[in-house]
Amino acid sequence: MAALVEPLGLERDVSRAVELLERLQRSGELPPQKLQALQRVLQSRFCSAIREVYEQLYDTLDITGSAEIRAHATAKATVAAFTASEGHAHPRVVELPKTDEGLGFNIMGGKEQNSPIYISRVIPGGVADRHGGLKRGDQLLSVNGVSVEGEQHEKAVELLKAAQGSVKLVVRYTPRVLEEMEARFEKMRSARRRQQHQSYSSLESRG
């Protein structure tokens, strides 16, 4: 069981770094071009995505040891998450409240179907739809810090059902893969329907 840790507040630290860069620019002690470039990086959406994923993993990874060990393990897990998303949209964190009406989205896929787990539908007017942030075509990477990559469909369902109060999802947007997966499933369903029809026709001819 992981030791209790204080939640990270990296957004505050990034803001302080930006303020420091602004002071350095005003002082004229360092080349302003380099300071401005670093400031743009810290204020970019990419940096925000890294910070959100790092904070979420830091708060939920089951790691014992010093703060330094925890930070190192979290950094490795964050790099792994972004490396896995290479060529796709970067991971992002979506937090939704857990209420009696459910989370308001459906998932499909899983190890048993030889595919990632995806958000296949965001229910109009549901919790996910009202809070925004989650899209059809998002691949589900983890639920409350537990990875569901390469896992059975049922594991993701169980994690979502077990969540209390709220649920933190790490997702990345890869709609093309979902479309390919749905096309493959539809092809399999069509093949089964044809097979059933042929079997029924064969029985009729014998009768």
UniProtKB/Swiss-Prot annotation:
Disulphide bridges, residue numbers: none
Q: Where is this region: Disordered?
A: 187-207
Write out the entry's keywords from A to Z. Cell junction, Cell membrane, Exocytosis, Membrane, Postsynaptic cell membrane, Protein transport, Synapse, Tight junction, Transport
Q: Which residues form the L27 domain?
A: 10-65
Is the keyword Transport assigned to this protein?
yes
What does the record note on quaternary structure? Forms a complex with CASK and CASKIN1. Component of the brain-specific heterotrimeric complex (LIN-10-LIN-2-LIN-7 complex) composed of at least APBA1, CASK, and LIN7, which associates with the motor protein KIF17 to transport vesicles along microtubules. Forms a heterotrimeric complex composed of MMP5, LIN7B and PATJ; the N-terminal L27 domain of PALS1 interacts with the L27 domain of PATJ and the C-terminal L27 domain of PALS1 interacts with the L27 domain of LIN7B. Forms a heterotrimeric complex with DLG1 and CASK via their L27 domains.
Protein known as = Protein lin-7 homolog B
**Could you tell me which species this protein originates from?**
Homo sapiens
The gene designation is: LIN7B
